[in-house]
Structures are given as C-alpha cells and as structure tokens.
A protein has these predicted regions:
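Active-site acidic/histidine clusters and adjacent loop/turn architecture
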Residues: 39-46
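Active-site-adjacent beta->alpha loops and helix N-cap segments on the catalytic face
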Residues: 35
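Short, structured loop/turn "capping" segments at alpha-beta junctions
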Residues: 49-50
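Short, well-ordered beta-to-alpha junction loops that form the rim of enzyme active sites
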Residues: 53-57
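Noncatalytic, typically N-terminal accessory segments of nucleic acid-processing enzymes
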Residues: 28-31
Length: 202
C-alpha cells in the first residue's frame, strides 16, 4: 500500500512509475521493481509518503510469503527498513494470529479489503477515533507500532475490523484444482506436494 499526502504527489509518483512499468494492467500495476526500490522512489517523489506492505502472508509475492525469498522485513527493504512501521495482515490472517510472531511486535497491524474486489469492499477495515487527517492517521499508526499512548493525539488507531481468517484463500495449505485443503503440519509431511496430482501446493 502506497500513501502520499497530495494529489500532486500521486501524479508525480505515477509519472515516475509509468517510466518503469504498466500502471494500467487489470487495476494493479505491473512493475519490474524490487520493493526496496519502490520504497526509495516513493520517498523521493513525496515527502510524508508511507508504504505499508500488504497481504504479508500471501504465498507468491508477499513480504513473508513462502515463495517471496524473504524471511525478514529487513531482507526485503534493506537500508530503508526503518521507514516501514505498519503491516497489512491480509484476509487469511488477523492481528491476533500475527501477534504470535514476536518479530512483528514493532509494527502496527492493519487490515484492508481489496480495492480490486468491489463486492468485498469494507469487509476488513481500520478503526480510528478523533479528527481524521493524513498526518494524524499515520502518527497514530506510528504510535501504535511503538506501543505509545495515543490519548494526546488528534487521531487514534483503535484496531481493525476483521472478517473470518479461515475464509481466506491462504488460511490453510492446499491445492484448489484438486480440492485439497490441509493443515500446515500435514502439508509438511507430504513435502508440500498435492497427494492427488503430485504438483506443489500453496
């Protein structure tokens, strides 16, 4: 998720990214770009911009996905890791599940619906109280990441509104084409190979 404070910043960032990839493909940009480099471009284009890695557990391309190549946020964002203070959990997990992983303790956890799935818009959301503003919202998330008292802030982060994680596509392992659904321990016992067709599972 990329946030910039003004429309002018958004236009500047869009122009820069259009030189790198396709911004019009099916509602989601296709960029041949590492996440760290996208963060650097965003920071250069817009003062006050914020990046929140989204759907962090999705297997294929997400920050902590099994196929991403990263085990830690620092492996992905390198020298710019300090600019990441929040993570979006995705539909297949919720903040309570993520809080079981101590390395995520220093991050605010947010939940969002997919903007490219209009029928499901709003099934997950972030709850704020107080006077909404761009700066206020991110100040509240930064305070939440540091476990600081938010009572003096104009805008406070209260938490998230969650759908049922077990309804998420990636809550359990499996192979959709073969209608196979397994607990992770059972997938590991099978070497993450579908027992029906012999192909890798997600």
């Amino acid at each position: 998720l990329v946030f910039v404070p003004t429309l002018e910043d958004a236009e500047r960032l869009s122009r820069r990214l259009a030189q790198i990839g396709n911004l019009n493909a099916d509602g989601r940009p296709i960029l041949g770009l590492d996440s760290r480099d996208l963060l650097e471009i965003m920071l250069e284009c817009a003062h006050g911009s914020v990046m929140i890695p989204a759907h962090v557990w999705t297997p294929w391309f997400a920050l902590f996905g099994s196929k991403s190549g990263f085990d830690r946020l620092e492996d992905c964002y390198g020298d710019l890791s300090e600019h990441i203070f929040a993570l979006e959990t995705g539909l297949s997990s919720d903040p309570a599940m993520n809080r079981l992983i101590s390395r995520l303790d220093g991050y605010a956890l947010v939940s969002n619906s997919d903007a490219h799935s209009g029928a499901n818009l709003g099934r997950e959301a972030n709850l704020f109280a107080g006077r909404p503003s761009y700066a206020g919202m991110f100040a509240a998330l930064r305070a939440s990441a540091k476990r600081q008292d938010q009572s003096a802030l104009d805008c406070r982060f209260l938490g998230t509104m969650e759908f049922y994680p077990d309804e998420g596509k990636y809550h359990l392992d499996g192979h959709r084409a073969c209608n196979v659904v397994l607990e992770p321990k059972d997938s590991l016992a099978l070497g993450n190979i579908c027992s029906v067709c012999g192909k890798p599972m997600t």
